[in-house]
Amino acid sequence: MSKPRKPKGRPISGWLILDKPVDFGSTEAVSKIKWLYKAEKAGHAGTLDPLASGMLPIALGDATKTVPYVMDGRKIYEFTVSWGEERATDDLEGDVTKSSDKRPSEQQIRDILPGYIGTISQVPPQFSAIKIAGERAYDLAREGETIEIPSREVDIFRLTLLACPDADSAHFEVECGKGTYVRALARDFGRELGCYGHVSGLRRTFVAPFAEGAMVPLADLVALEAIEDMDERLAALDALLIDTCEALSSLPHLVINDDQAHRLKMGNPILVRGRDAPVAESEAYATARGKLIAIGEIGQGEFRPKRVFA
């Protein structure tokens, strides 16, 4: 008989809201956090480009089951557009492909913004993670291929011009939905204004439902490595985690008893009839004694588990 496998890390669950520094990739950040926490598994809720800084929510352990609910949330970015150059990557990293001596006035910039608010059609950048015929667009672009990426609808809830520090740049804030490319906004601004443009600075300040104040700088986490006692170090790190349920705050919440929790963990539905039961059919999550038990569907007076938590 083979021996049972030992877990490769601690069975912790929670969210760390990392303030990612510039020149640090999202995958690299996840690996670093997983190692620091000695976690069994980890994953992030939305890539941030290496040249971008700011909020990168990282799920540890069972919290990785809640990643899709954060991926779909609203996001807020502050970004700077530099005028006069369009680049292959639509940011500072790429080669210049088009240039112009023209510069827009502040009023000209303000005049175009209403056209970018609401549900708009957007073509993702050539260097993006979009799949074309089974391959990532950025892989094809690196091989020198010019590819036709179909446009898609994205939601822009708010778009504000914050400042024009000089004739060559403008600073914006945007609140947007899933799948929006800020680099594509900069590209399209430049084309409409007839001066070309690219993102020269990008910071994400909000990923629903996590507030900006929840962010933890990477340097603060690394500093905890100086704690020699491993138990003390891990306790200090764990104190920075946000409860897994926080990612589900947009869903109806069922508070259940121990018997119901046992049924759900066995994969069985439970009855939710009663005065406090949600009326409409919907997705929901259930907790017992303050602990997340399951995410599931409510329908026909039952809660049916889809994802069960240890």
UniProtKB/Swiss-Prot annotation:
Active site (catalytic residues): 49
Gene Ontology biological-process annotations: mRNA pseudouridine synthesis; tRNA pseudouridine synthesis
Sorted UniProt keywords:
Isomerase, tRNA processing
**Gene3D superfamilies to which the protein is assigned, alphabetical:** Pseudouridine synthase
The record's Pfam families line, in alphabetical order, gives: TruB_C_2, TruB_N
Enzyme Commission numbers on file: 5.4.99.25
- GO molecular function terms attached to this record: RNA binding; tRNA pseudouridine(55) synthase activity
Q: Which InterPro entries match?
A: PsdUridine_synth_cat_dom_sf, PsdUridine_synth_N, tRNA_psdUridine_synth_TruB, TruB_C
Disulfide topology:
none
Q: Catalyses which reaction? A: uridine(55) in tRNA = pseudouridine(55) in tRNA
Q: What does this protein do?
A: Responsible for synthesis of pseudouridine from uracil-55 in the psi GC loop of transfer RNAs.
The UniProt entry's sequence similarity note says: Belongs to the pseudouridine synthase TruB family. Type 1 subfamily.
* Protein name, per record: tRNA pseudouridine synthase B
